[in-house]
Amino acid sequence: MLMWGCAVAIAVYVGAAISGAHYNPSVTIAMAVWNRFPWKRVVPYILSQLVGAFGAALTLWIMFRGFAAPFEAANKIVRGEFGSQLSGMVFATYIPNPAAVGMTPLAYAQVPLYVGFMSEFIGTMFLVLMIFVLIEERNDLKPHITFFPVALGVVVIAIVSITAPLSMTSLNGARDLGPRFLAYLLGWGQMAFPGPRGEFWIPTVAPILGGIFAGFVYNKIVLPLYPKKSAEPIVAAESKPSVSA
């Protein structure tokens, strides 16, 4: 969990001054819907996010591929068949977490798909809501820009600690969809698309809707409650100290 927070913080430090650290379609779309980001940049940004996620997954696969076959052999996993989500989860998210909750009928009964949808919707809602809060000029408690990535990382750690068993905490359609496509190409087949329960769409759609709803909560409920910044007092010309020649 700490790793996720650190990864997010580092990524924001690297990309904030270049692209605003838009690594997540849920954030990009929510910002555009609520007039915080130009629509003309949405599609290029999302394509970049997908390509970046695919490239990152491919890089990690090249580095760690030697561990995949022994793990699958030891656990009697046949890639592409049911049960191979236990190895495919390094790429894609599943409902529920195959390693933490399981892949049995009981596990699926404990975590129905609607619960996984709620997990992603609510988790992303809080993520995007906190982003709005952390960048709000009227928020006197917002962190200095230097510490914004750290604050965001802490938010991610908190969300992961709650939602990881339920939906593996996607929060980001690009983070799931890009690596999921790679998993499909590498032989996970139907365990990638459509997924063992047909749930491939949830880690993308639920976060987008959750992000948009976060914008609604922020702009319609939270923002009006902030105290308005008072105007700077106007100093009359005659009250200004004169300068001697």
Regions found by a protein language model. Give the residues of each.
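Membrane-interface helix-loop junctions and terminal tails of multi-pass membrane proteins
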Residues: 1-245
